Amino acid sequence: MKHIIILGDGMADHAIDRLGGKTPLQYADTPYMNFLAKQGKTGMLNTIPDGFLPGSEVANTAILGYDLNKVYEGRGPLEAASIGYEMQPNDMAIRCNIIELANGRIKNHHGGHLTTEEGDLLIKFLDKELGNDQVKFITGIQYRHLLVIKNGNKHITCAPPHDHPNEEWKPLLVKPEEGYTEYNSDRITPQATADLLNDLIIKSQSLLANHPFNRQRTEKANSIWPWSGGYRPSMSTLMQRYPEIKSGSVISAVDLIRGIGHYAGLDIIKVPGATGLANTNYEGKASAAIEALKKQDFVFLHIEASDEAGHDGDLDLKLQTIRYLDARIVKPVYEAVSEWEEPVCIALLPDHPTPVEIRTHVKEPVPFAIWHRGIQPDKVTTYDEKSCTRGEYGLLSLQQFMETFMKIK
């Protein structure tokens, strides 16, 4: 049996008055998601371990069956792997957003949804102006880039910008980790690391404000914002962990997810036109997943758009991304693999909720559905946050999902 996970990032949500007390998943027209729930088995999943913030790097790593307490090193190292940057032993890699500040506050976490070409222009400019033997700016995707600090210390506290929309930015500057007292002579101190990053933030603002790109633009990409740093992780591959998987692929527009896939031993498939937004190439991603499954045992198909809509607080857009996921991802994948001689097991789930009224991730269980041709359905008939609480799988946590999924034969 082959296995595919279809993950709608941030797709889960809360009940919304405008939708008559329904969640976006309950309200949107999703016949194929509902089919998987009705003809399959469902449940709820805790994706965030105790002591961790509800980030996509945490949730997606847990969904794939890893113990975060053993492998977690933050987003930076994962994104470094995705873009082909070979981390050295004393490197600290940290995510570097390009964001928009206005009136002393974080207006958005994405600088007005930069294209990758626009982000590359600004990151190369910043590396020329601020980079040196200790500091290197590296282009990623869109507004999501990488900052590498030689001998940097990961024991710092950073504020993910998507968690703090409309908040004053100065109180959110980098701080040394409270209570951390160990000394490593190979690295600068947490305080020195925080000071260095804050200095780069301040200097980036004057440089970006005066860049011709921002002078001709209504939305401003006018500050960097580093967060989620760490060292090179040590992870076993999925093939080493699950004998059912001989080979597999990850399909995502997001460096973070590609980086997880890299360390998990998956091939990284890059789909032209995959943007991570509502305008992504859904058909191309579905087709790539189907073709990969013809040759391999496992595919992790990640769709980012609903998470971005949640962060923007855009309910109409979130509803649209959910409908698109149903009609342009779930439908073609199901219709293709359901006809194959070799059975394929499909799992559908988000990694975490990103409620539009909160505009950030929350640590709550998410609904999942698992279908294959011979499965005995439970009594759930629709796919959403409420219905799946009645599912036969009950409430699973962390690695239990992958263990359950891979045992299905």
Where are these regions (language model features)?
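Feature captures the catalytic ectodomains and active-site-proximal regions of enzymes
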Residues: 1-409
